[in-house]
C-alpha cells in the first residue's frame, strides 16, 4: 500500500524535482534549527538536519532533505544577508568545492514504530574565477540569498559553474536517483513501477 508522500520542505526546487519524478506529494514545511553544531562534520550536519526535518512533520511517509556547500571543511549554508553572500562567492571563486545533501525518508504507518531510511550524497563542483563586479551584480539579482553556498546552479549561477562531477540534481537540492531508491525501499512505488507504466528498454515495438 502506498502512502501519501509529505515533503517537509518549503523549497520550490525540491517540489519541482519531485514533480520531475512524477511522485504525487503535499508540502508541509518543517520548522527546525539549521545551525551547525560546533565541531560537527559536514556529512553529519546535513544528515542530522534532514532527520530532524522529517521528524518535525506529521505524516505516514515524510521526505526531508538538507543541502550544504562545503569548502575546505567549512559548511556554507544559506547566507545571512547580502554581505555574507558576497563573502561566500568570493571564497568559492576559482575553486572546487563539495555539495552535500542529506536525505531522510520516514515511514510511520498508523500507530506503528517509525522507520527511517537515509543517505548522504556528494557532488563535486568547479567554480569559475569571479571578480568583485561579477559578485556584486549577482548578489543584486537576489538569487543567492536563499541558496546554500549563495548560488543556484539551475539559475543565473549556473554560468559560473565550470564542471560538475556527480549528481546535478543533488546540487539543486534533491538527488533524484538516491531519493527514488529510498522511496522504493520505504514501500512507495514509483510511476514506472506501476502496471502499464513506461516500458523497459525504450526500444521500438
From Swiss-Prot:
GO cellular component: cytoplasm
Keywords in alphabetical order: Cytoplasm, Hydrolase, Nucleotide metabolism
GO biological process: nucleotide metabolic process
Keyword Kinase: no
Active site: residue positions: 66
Enzyme class: hydrolase
Family per similarity comment: Belongs to the Maf family. YhdE subfamily.
Function of the molecule: Nucleoside triphosphate pyrophosphatase that hydrolyzes dTTP and UTP. May have a dual role in cell division arrest and in preventing the incorporation of modified nucleotides into cellular nucleic acids.
Name used for this protein in its record: dTTP/UTP pyrophosphatase
Organism for this UniProt entry: Anaeromyxobacter sp. (strain Fw109-5)
